[in-house]
A protein has these predicted regions:
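A short, Lys/Arg-rich alpha-helix, primarily the initiator
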Residues: 3-29
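Short alpha-helical DNA-recognition segment
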Residues: 31-51
């Protein structure tokens, strides 16, 4: 019988910050503002992109794939 294991909230701040820095680097290389990238992602508010770039939010893989597509890069390029 399976043991009852408490699930910890996975969050690796160092990796989130490293991914965020890469998002910022590629966004700036494409000469996009945070607001423009957010709009392309379907968000009405640029603050989500701002929080991602600073490593303040945990986001899902689908959102990361969307950002990579918009920035015209491989998703691997965003990984630390």
């Amino acid at each position: 019988m399976a043991k009852n294991i408490k699930r910890k909230n996975f969050r690796n701040d160092n990796q989130l910050k490293a991914i965020g820095e890469k998002i910022r680097k590629f966004r700036l290389a494409k000469e996009l503002t945070q607001a423009e990238l957010a709009f392309e992602c379907g968000d009405k508010d640029w603050s989500q992109i701002s929080r991602m770039e600073r490593g303040l939010v945990n986001f899902n893989i689908s959102y990361l794939l969307l950002i990579a597509e918009i920035l015209e890069i491989s998703p691997k390029e965003l990984l630390p």
